[in-house]
A protein has these predicted regions:
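Hydrophobic/aromatic-enriched cytosolic interaction surfaces used to assemble or bind macromolecules
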Residues: 1-312
């Protein structure tokens, strides 16, 4: 996504990191003879009271291999928009997108770092070329760079949608199309892929049903009707815009009982083939991962699965 100056790294693999004030989620994926091997996946505690150098100190102590490094932006630090591509040369694309996005941001466009990535062309002729534009807060990108200053092979700041796309593309049924859904208490995200191709992403504004309606049983924790509506809108757009056969394989990102309840509800309401993602089955893991670690490190794993270096 947001590429930094290229720094040399050896081996075919990548380190993925998500950064919080009190912890780092770490994943290392190596690619050996076409297989992705998750060699390390853990949460590293950070003493937030130790000051701005605490994260770098934790990374130094972790004794990481010399591999390219990706960090992942948090949801509050960027805006993702599907827009018609400006008719300009590639070298001018980011500048053109900056002004196209300025009215859609809740921060000054001058304070944004812009990048773009393509989606397949629409199925019907006469429609303009579409692409995703990402506007990240410059301060967030700079924070990532500062936290990873001790890692000379840090080269990419990624976004959650592309990390989830990497995971969805690894699902065995992805050749026929896969939807990967990740939810929390107040927000969610769905990505649609077919084979290795990223087609669509949608962010969801969710609410906890127990707050909205006083529902407290296990199957009523989330606003499932709203999730189903947003999911159906995404699938309808995918079929209509790209003239693709329907996706009926839905994978729920690990999130403890929340994911299990959601999978149960959506399987009943849609008739889709629905399951909760298990990284132990998706990848070759050198150490089995408990569900809590999978949930905490999911985006770091997706970032570590990235193989391309730059987007444009």
């Amino acid at each position: 996504m947001f590429g930094l100056p290229k720094r040399e790294a050896h081996n075919k693999g990548r380190i993925g990191l998500t950064i919080a004030s009190d912890h780092l989620a770490l994943a290392i994926v190596n690619h050996v003879r076409g297989q992705a091997i998750l060699t390390r996946c853990e949460v590293l505690p950070v003493d937030a009271a130790a000051g701005p150098g605490a994260q770098a100190a934790v990374l130094r102590a972790a004794e990481l291999p010399r591999l390219p490094v990706s960090s992942v932006l948090s949801a509050d630090d960027y805006k993702l928009a599907l827009v018609e591509a400006p008719d300009v040369p590639p070298a001018e694309m980011r500048a053109a997108m900056r002004w196209r996005l300025k009215d859609a941001l809740d921060f000054k466009v001058e304070d944004a770092v812009i990048d773009v990535f393509d989606v397949p062309p629409p199925s019907r002729g006469g429609q303009g070329r579409m692409m995703y534009a990402v506007a990240a807060r410059r301060s967030a990108v700079e924070r990532s760079a500062a936290a990873l200053l001790s890692m000379p092979t840090f080269d990419v700041v990624d976004v959650p949608e592309l990390c989830l796309g990497n995971l969805a593309a690894a699902v065995p049924e992805s050749a026929r199309g896969v939807a990967l859904l990740r939810v929390g208490e107040t927000s969610g995200m769905v990505v649609l892929v077919r084979g290795k191709t990223f087609y669509f992403a949608r962010q969801m504004d969710l609410k906890v049903a127990s707050r909205a309606a006083g529902v407290s049983d296990r199957n009523g924790q989330l606003d499932c009707p709203n999730i189903l509506l947003e999911l159906q809108r995404s699938l309808d757009y995918y079929e209509r815009q790209f003239d693709q056969p329907p996706i009926t394989r839905l994978v729920i990102a690990p999130a403890g009982p929340l994911a299990d309840a959601l999978a149960e509800n959506l399987s009943r309401d849609t008739g889709f083939d629905v399951s909760v993602l298990d990284l132990n089955s998706l990848l070759n893991c050198t150490t089995p991962l408990v569900p809590a670690t999978q949930a905490a490190c999911l985006l770091a794993v997706g970032a570590a699965m990235r193989q391309e270096r730059r987007s444009l």
